Structure formats: structure tokens, C-alpha cells
């Protein structure tokens, strides 16, 4: 067995053991103090959980999608190994077209409407 395979095996085994132990130990003896929310030593006034807007989550996912698309399309002409610039332009246009179709679909379905 090569040195690299030995290192990868030991790393994977150690990571798996540590992950299992970290999930297993807290279930053995849950502490009431650690399970309660902390508010400067006082009893909590209400729930520590706040409601999360699903529309905000959808807008955030769309932002990340288009941000990633821009990050991938900007260096495309320099990093592309396609034979002609026209082929690069065609692929970039196809990606933009598919993303535009997805945006139009979200718009028609009402996913971009913030207030109801």
C-alpha cells in the first residue's frame, strides 16, 4: 500500500470516528442547562426561534444562483479551450437563455412577489 493511500485511509477513518463520537456523546447525558437558551441568566421571555420567511429564502437562493452564473461566465472567454470564439459565445448564450427561462418561470409562478 502506498504512503498516499495509507494517509487517506487514516484520515478518513479518524474523521469518521470523530464524527460518530461527536454525535453519540451528547445523546448519552443531555444537560438541562445546555439545552436551554441563554438570556443573561434570566428565564427566556419567549421562544428563541424566529419565524423564517420562505420567500426570503427563495430570493436568496435565486441571488446565489445568478451570482454563481456571473462568476462562471465572466472568465469563460479566457479559460475556454473551444476552437472558435463563436462556439464560446453560443455556449454562454445557451446558459444565459436557460437561466432566463428559469427566472421567467419563477416570475410567472409568483416566487418573486415579496408582499402578497
Swiss-Prot record:
InterPro entries: NADH_UbQ/plastoQ_OxRdtase_su3, NDAH_ubi_oxred_su3_sf. Its main location: mitochondrion. Its EC number is 7.1.1.2. It holds the Pfam family Oxidored_q4. It is an enzyme of class 7 (translocase). It catalyses: a ubiquinone + NADH + 5 H(+)(in) = a ubiquinol + NAD(+) + 4 H(+)(out). Disulfide bonds: none annotated. The chain crosses the membrane at residues 3-23, 56-76, 85-105. It is found in: Mitochondrion membrane. Keywords: Electron transport, Membrane, Mitochondrion, NAD, Respiratory chain, Translocase, Transmembrane, Transmembrane helix, Transport, Ubiquinone. One of its GO terms (cellular component) is mitochondrial membrane. GO terms for molecular function: NADH dehydrogenase (ubiquinone) activity. It is a multi-pass membrane protein. Belongs to the complex I subunit 3 family. Core subunit of the mitochondrial membrane respiratory chain NADH dehydrogenase (Complex I) that is believed to belong to the minimal assembly required for catalysis. Complex I functions in the transfer of electrons from NADH to the respiratory chain. The immediate electron acceptor for the enzyme is believed to be ubiquinone. This is NADH-ubiquinone oxidoreductase chain 3.
Amino acid at each position: 500500500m502506498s504512503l498516499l493511500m495509507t494517509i487517506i485511509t487514516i484520515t478518513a477513518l479518524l474523521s469518521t470516528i470523530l464524527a460518530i463520537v461527536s454525535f453519540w456523546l451528547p445523546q448519552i447525558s443531555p444537560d438541562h442547562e445546555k439545552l436551554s437558551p441563554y438570556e443573561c441568566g434570566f428565564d427566556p421571555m419567549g421562544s428563541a426561534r424566529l419565524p423564517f420567511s420562505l420567500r426570503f429564502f427563495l430570493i436568496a437562493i435565486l441571488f446565489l444562483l445568478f451570482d454563481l452564473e456571473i462568476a462562471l461566465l465572466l472568465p469563460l472567454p479566457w479559460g475556454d479551450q473551444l476552437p472558435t470564439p463563436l462556439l464560446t459565445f453560443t455556449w454562454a448564450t445557451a446558459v444565459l437563455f436557460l437561466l432566463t427561462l428559469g427566472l421567467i418561470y419563477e416570475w410567472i409562478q409568483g416566487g418573486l412577489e415579496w408582499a402578497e
